[in-house]
């Protein structure tokens, strides 16, 4: 199964979060807000193995960067090998290993976490 990623999950203004806890990556807090159900480790398999190349040649970390806000490089200007070793990529890797939860696309990601808890 894949769980739905909700952009505004803290308040869920469109009521998109599943009501059955088992099928949600979010948990409801006592004050009515939501948080991610699981703790994020400061590592990511996708960053190393599942980059995304957008229609216009931009390289982004993964499929969670739907709006290409974390551009690591542009294949029209560099080879993938050059992008893999450039400063943007190195900086993103470093930030992820320091605090994955502080990167917007990573804070709302289910990679490496167990969502399906009974």
Residue ranges and their predicted role:
Residues 1-83, 87-98, 111-118:
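Radical SAM enzyme [4Fe-4S]-AdoMet core and its adjacent flexible, acidic
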């Amino acid at each position: 199964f894949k769980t739905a990623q909700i952009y505004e999950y803290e308040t869920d203004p469109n009521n998109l979060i599943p009501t059955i806890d088992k099928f949600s990556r979010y948990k409801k807090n006592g004050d009515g807000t939501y948080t991610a159900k699981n703790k994020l480790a400061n590592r990511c398999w996708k960053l190393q193995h599942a980059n995304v190349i957008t229609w216009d040649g931009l390289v982004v970390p993964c499929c969670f960067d739907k709006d290409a806000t974390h551009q690591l490089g542009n294949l029209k200007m560099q080879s993938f090998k050059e992008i893999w070793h450039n400063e943007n990529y190195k900086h993103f890797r470093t930030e992820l290993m320091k605090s994955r939860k502080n990167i917007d696309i990573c804070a709302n990601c289910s990679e490496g976490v167990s969502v399906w808890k009974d």
